[in-house]
């Protein structure tokens, strides 16, 4: 089992979790290929983390299975934008931590 972790990525955890759920339990090679055609920013990020986890384990992508793909919330950058009558409203810029675990596929399948 090998792991990869990407922290403080400027990405909404809610949107990233939608992509992370799609690849859980998939073959790593198939997961990377399917993420390549998704239009989300999260797809590109998660694809790189899966590739990193496979490389960390020293195995080929065709022999690896995504055991878990988890997206946790990181700190939120708070900015303010000016509004009418001298007021200011907050802008939330969320960050995420992406965690991927990859295991080697069993030979009997």
UniProtKB/Swiss-Prot annotation:
Please give the PROSITE patterns that the UniProt record associates with this protein.
Answer: RIBOSOMAL_L22
Q: Which GO terms describe its cellular component?
A: cytosolic large ribosomal subunit
Superkingdom of the source? Bacteria
UniProt keyword list: Ribonucleoprotein, Ribosomal protein, RNA-binding, rRNA-binding
Name the InterPro entries for this protein: Ribosomal_uL22, Ribosomal_uL22_bac/chlpt-type, Ribosomal_uL22_bac/org-type, Ribosomal_uL22_CS, Ribosomal_uL22_sf
**A GO term for molecular function:** structural constituent of ribosome
BP GO annotations? translation
Q: Does the keyword ATP-binding apply?
A: no
Q: Name one Pfam family in it.
A: Ribosomal_L22
What the entry lists under NCBIfam families is as follows:
rplV_bact (TIGR01044)
The UniProt subunit note reads as follows:
Part of the 50S ribosomal subunit.
Q: Which family does it belong to?
A: Belongs to the universal ribosomal protein uL22 family.
Q: What does this protein do?
A: This protein binds specifically to 23S rRNA; its binding is stimulated by other ribosomal proteins, e.g. L4, L17, and L20. It is important during the early stages of 50S assembly. It makes multiple contacts with different domains of the 23S rRNA in the assembled 50S subunit and ribosome. The globular domain of the protein is located near the polypeptide exit tunnel on the outside of the subunit, while an extended beta-hairpin is found that lines the wall of the exit tunnel in the center of the 70S ribosome.
What is the protein named?
Large ribosomal subunit protein uL22
Gene designation: rplV
